[in-house]
């Protein structure tokens, strides 16, 4: 009787092994699909390309006009503000790219020593960047700006900076999120269409950089 039970258990384990392999293979395929950047986006992802563009448009169309009115009342020049906004986006993207490069370097070492396949290393690397992106999404925007760009706006009075701070914090935060997207995104400053309104300083379009 005991021998029969052992034999049945052994046969059950043998029969289960292919199922376990199939389950692992399915999980790996699903994980791989999650990391594909292509045109597929998760509707629940708060930092998807679509959501990032929506946040940029909302800032440009709703937040910026209020700040612009305050700055105009203080006789601030639009060109100076435009330069500040561009520098904020540029600096934030640079800081985000540094962090991404550090992740690249760390996973480059892991690829040599871990024995994982290049595809698996790429997936883990992308997941780490996505986790960083989500962490920044939930970060206090003004604190992020202070830590990453402490010298911002030194040429302005405290009153003007008080008006600008919510906007520059939003720009810095959003630029970090855009830079960590796959592919990276940024406002299309190179093709900024001249406007009759000198205060129309934000590009209409978002451009994609090369894939990570």
Feature names for model-found ranges:
Residues 1-212:
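Extended, amphipathic alpha-helical stalk segments that mediate dimerization
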